[in-house]
């Protein structure tokens, strides 16, 4: 490999063409010191200068292989400080010689030294002994753009982590870390903060039901506040209740499961008894003046506020009955008695108060005398021996309520120190001429309990809870049977349902249910059970069918409706045959007859298809009931029959659509 040499530049030689100031003395063809990625340093020849991007291309020969790289201007000037200024260059210590095959004789006698390579010769990178200048600048290698971007992302990540740590620290200062449920509390608060009540309020349209179902949430009591219990109930609108149930994953991570329930009315913990009464029992008061049977009952867990809602505020064990639903109903009853419309009826008001405890009925106004519930010849339920006292004002009604509550059975439970253990029924009866005119039953149900909550209780307490749950279950079954139009309604399953029978099946009966719930997280299971119970009660709608059924009937209901329609059509046809009309039938009458005939044919097709389907199912069951039946043959035969049935049903569907379209057109013309 040819050597290279350095010649001193004399003043007589023409100076080199000056470069731009920021490039210094860097020119194409000079030798510069470079640093490799493995920290080796050697000489290389400058072959190209890019002034726009401020980088320099250098080349060298290493092991008979020509190599090159691009180096930015800053790195070149750091490794070669003598090239930084063209006007006053600093003296440079001689670099270590390049390999003998590439470097010739050098002379450093003059101040200014310019290294000029021989023509078509390139510096060698085989030698590793290249000394750094005697007074070097800071040997700082510029980082690649990729590395710079990585460092930038890392700095942003560290900044975000610092901010998150600061946020966690601030949150830790805001909450009481001694509360074990502060994480759940923050989840609930965050959920409520981002809750859009405008979207939730229209989750389910309000429908008219035979039972008005309302839910009332009570505030946290002193015991729950002392135990740092959380409020997991949210009432975002006037008919929606949300339960934030705390769950735990397999990795012990806690999360919320939010369950939503829709009712006729929902009241939060700030609602007063007057507000609850305005939307629950007050609309039913006037019905008893029209010979109606009204019922309002409170249902819920022990200690959820049933007696508070029905009876009034508590001050210790003393209760202010003037603010309960009992008193509010009595006030409206006596106000309506003075109305000119009902004043002519000469009505008298009576009050009764009895309890149902352990499957037996006791009169609370007659020192808890045991009573019998019997059915008379008119299939009306009568409580034999029940004392009825005439009342003339609200004060007398409150005296009866106070007397009855003083005799009512109560026990201490794990939730409440003074808990009612019986179903209390207070009735306001209107009589005209000694006969029943109307009745309003106000029922304060005993609190439902789970068996798991009474494991440490006495046997008597457990029997009490079992009897209470039995009667509440019977009440729900009766409501469901009425909602599904079952032929039998189990009213005789408990004394409670026997007493309330006329409130459900009477001609002018109207009922309202107030479900009271506890907001604490420890009562979450009981709260969900109460809401599910109330949700099932809501299914008893105005027409006797559950509201969640489809708009169009199916199955046997569809065939029954079609049969009735066909029967009416046939009767009308027979009637028209016997009536002799002297004139010719009009076009409208002719169209009506054609519509009836089409409906009759459709009914016959449907009946034939249904009979064929039932016969086919019986044949399949007989074949498959044998031991040696052919499975493949049965499957093939079933598929062929199904195809035929599908074709018939499709044809019936087309005819029904055409008939419906004709009826719509006819109604528009009329």
From Swiss-Prot:
<keyword id="KW-0206">Cytoskeleton</keyword>
<keyword id="KW-0175">Coiled coil</keyword>
<dbReference type="InterPro" id="IPR001752">
    <property type="entry name" value="Kinesin_motor_dom"/>
</dbReference>
<dbReference type="Pfam" id="PF00225">
    <property type="entry name" value="Kinesin"/>
</dbReference>
<dbReference type="InterPro" id="IPR036961">
    <property type="entry name" value="Kinesin_motor_dom_sf"/>
</dbReference>
<dbReference type="GO" id="GO:0005874">
    <property type="term" value="C:microtubule"/>
</dbReference>
<keyword id="KW-0995">Kinetochore</keyword>
<keyword id="KW-0547">Nucleotide-binding</keyword>
<keyword id="KW-0132">Cell division</keyword>
<dbReference type="GO" id="GO:0003777">
    <property type="term" value="F:microtubule motor activity"/>
</dbReference>
<comment type="similarity">
    <text>Belongs to the TRAFAC class myosin-kinesin ATPase superfamily. Kinesin family. MCAK/KIF2 subfamily.</text>
</comment>
<dbReference type="GO" id="GO:0051310">
    <property type="term" value="P:metaphase chromosome alignment"/>
</dbReference>
<feature type="modified residue" description="Phosphothreonine; by PLK1">
    <location>
        <position position="122"/>
    </location>
</feature>
<feature type="binding site">
    <location>
        <begin position="300"/>
        <end position="307"/>
    </location>
    <ligand>
        <name>ATP</name>
    </ligand>
</feature>
<dbReference type="GO" id="GO:0051301">
    <property type="term" value="P:cell division"/>
</dbReference>
<comment type="function">
    <text>Plus end-directed microtubule-dependent motor required for spindle assembly and chromosome movement during mitosis. Has microtubule depolymerization activity. Plays a role in chromosome congression.</text>
</comment>
<dbReference type="GO" id="GO:0000776">
    <property type="term" value="C:kinetochore"/>
</dbReference>
<feature type="modified residue" description="Phosphoserine; by PLK1">
    <location>
        <position position="201"/>
    </location>
</feature>
<dbReference type="GO" id="GO:0007018">
    <property type="term" value="P:microtubule-based movement"/>
</dbReference>
<dbReference type="Pfam" id="PF22923">
    <property type="entry name" value="KIF2A-like_1st"/>
</dbReference>
<keyword id="KW-0067">ATP-binding</keyword>
<dbReference type="InterPro" id="IPR027417">
    <property type="entry name" value="P-loop_NTPase"/>
</dbReference>
<dbReference type="GO" id="GO:0005813">
    <property type="term" value="C:centrosome"/>
</dbReference>
<keyword id="KW-0137">Centromere</keyword>
<keyword id="KW-0498">Mitosis</keyword>
<feature type="coiled-coil region">
    <location>
        <begin position="146"/>
        <end position="173"/>
    </location>
</feature>
<dbReference type="GO" id="GO:0005524">
    <property type="term" value="F:ATP binding"/>
</dbReference>
<dbReference type="GO" id="GO:0051983">
    <property type="term" value="P:regulation of chromosome segregation"/>
</dbReference>
<dbReference type="InterPro" id="IPR019821">
    <property type="entry name" value="Kinesin_motor_CS"/>
</dbReference>
<dbReference type="InterPro" id="IPR027640">
    <property type="entry name" value="Kinesin-like_fam"/>
</dbReference>
<keyword id="KW-0131">Cell cycle</keyword>
<keyword id="KW-0493">Microtubule</keyword>
<keyword id="KW-0597">Phosphoprotein</keyword>
<dbReference type="GO" id="GO:0005819">
    <property type="term" value="C:spindle"/>
</dbReference>
<dbReference type="GO" id="GO:0007019">
    <property type="term" value="P:microtubule depolymerization"/>
</dbReference>
<keyword id="KW-0158">Chromosome</keyword>
<dbReference type="GO" id="GO:0005737">
    <property type="term" value="C:cytoplasm"/>
</dbReference>
<dbReference type="InterPro" id="IPR054473">
    <property type="entry name" value="KIF2A-like_N"/>
</dbReference>
<keyword id="KW-0505">Motor protein</keyword>
<protein>
    <recommendedName>
        <fullName>Kinesin-like protein KIF2B</fullName>
    </recommendedName>
</protein>
<keyword id="KW-0963">Cytoplasm</keyword>
<dbReference type="GO" id="GO:0008017">
    <property type="term" value="F:microtubule binding"/>
</dbReference>
């Amino acid at each position: 490999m040819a050597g290279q040499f350095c010649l001193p530049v004399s003043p007589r030689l023409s100076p080199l063409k000056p470069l731009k100031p920021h490039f210094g003395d860097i020119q194409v063809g000079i030798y510069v010191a470079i640093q490799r990625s493995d920290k080796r340093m050697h000489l290389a020849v400058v072959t190209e200068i890019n002034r726009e991007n401020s980088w320099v291309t250098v080349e060298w020969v290493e092991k008979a292989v020509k190599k090159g790289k691009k180096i930015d201007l800053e790195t070149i000037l750091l490794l070669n400080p003598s090239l930084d200024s063209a006007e006053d260059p600093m003296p440079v210590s001689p670099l270590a010689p390049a390999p003998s095959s590439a470097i010739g004789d050098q002379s450093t006698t003059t101040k200014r030294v310019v290294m000029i390579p021989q023509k078509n010769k390139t510096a060698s990178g085989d030698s590793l002994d290249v000394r750094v200048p005697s007074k070097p600048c800071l040997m700082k290698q510029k980082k690649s753009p990729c590395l710079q971007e990585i460092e930038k992302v890392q700095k942003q990540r560290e900044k975000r982590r610092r901010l998150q740590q600061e946020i966690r620290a601030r949150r830790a200062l805001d909450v009481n870390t001694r509360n074990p449920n502060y994480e759940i509390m923050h989840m609930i608060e965050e959920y409520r903060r981002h809750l859009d009540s405008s979207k939730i309020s229209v989750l389910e349209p309000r429908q008219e039901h035979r039972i008005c179902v309302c839910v009332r949430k009570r505030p946290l009591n002193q015991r729950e506040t002392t135990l740092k219990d959380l409020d997991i109930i949210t009432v975002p609108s006037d008919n929606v209740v949300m339960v934030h149930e705390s769950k735990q994953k397999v990795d012990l991570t806690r999360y919320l499961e939010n369950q939503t329930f829709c009712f006729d009315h929902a009241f939060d913990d700030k609602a007063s008894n007057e507000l609850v009464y305005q939307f629950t029992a007050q609309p039913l008061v006037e019905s008893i003046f029209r010979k109606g049977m009204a019922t309002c009952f409170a249902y819920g867990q022990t200690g959820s506020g049933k007696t508070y809602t029905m009876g009034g505020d508590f001050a210790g064990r003393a209760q202010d009955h003037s603010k309960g639903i009992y008193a509010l109903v009595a006030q409206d009853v006596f106000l309506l008695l003075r109305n000119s419309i009902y004043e002519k009826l000469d009505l008298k008001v009576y009050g009764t108060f009895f309890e149902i405890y352990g499957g037996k009925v006791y009169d609370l106004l007659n020192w808890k005398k045991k009573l019998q519930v019997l059915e008379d010849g008119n299939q009306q339920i009568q409580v034999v021996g029940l004392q009825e006292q005439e009342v003339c004002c609200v004060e007398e009604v409150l005296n009866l309520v106070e007397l009855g509550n003083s005799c009512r059975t109560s026990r201490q439970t794990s939730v409440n120190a003074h808990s009612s253990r019986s179903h209390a029924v207070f009735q306001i009866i209107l009589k005209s001429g000694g006969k029943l005119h109307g009745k309003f039953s106000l029922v304060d149900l005993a609190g439902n309990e789970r068996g798991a909550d009474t494991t440490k209780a006495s046997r008597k307490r457990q029997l009490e809870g079992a009897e209470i749950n039995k009667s509440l279950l019977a009440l729900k079954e009766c409501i469901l049977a009425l909602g599904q139009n079952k032929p039998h309604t189990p009213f005789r399953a408990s004394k409670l349902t026997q007493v309330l029978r006329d409130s459900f099946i009477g001609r002018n009966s109207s009922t309202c249910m107030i479900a009271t719930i506890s907001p604490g997280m420890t009562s979450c299971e009981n709260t969900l059970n109460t809401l599910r119970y109330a949700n099932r009660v809501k299914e008893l709608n105005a027409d006797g069918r559950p509201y969640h059924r489809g708009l169009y009937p199916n199955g046997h209901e569809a065939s029954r409706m079609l049969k009735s329609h066909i029967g009416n059509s046939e009767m009308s046809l027979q009637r028209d045959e016997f009536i002799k009309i002297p004139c010719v039938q009009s076009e409208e009458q002719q169209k009506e007859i054609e519509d009836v005939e089409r409906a009759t044919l459709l009914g016959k097709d449907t009946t034939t298809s249904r009979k064929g389907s039932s016969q086919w199912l019986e044949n399949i069951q007989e074949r498959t009931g044998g031991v040696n039946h052919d499975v493949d043959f049965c499957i093939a035969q079933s598929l062929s029959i199904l195809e035929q049935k599908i074709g018939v049903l499709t044809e019936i569907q087309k005819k029904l659509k055409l008939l419906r379209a004709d009826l719509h057109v006819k109604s528009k013309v009329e």
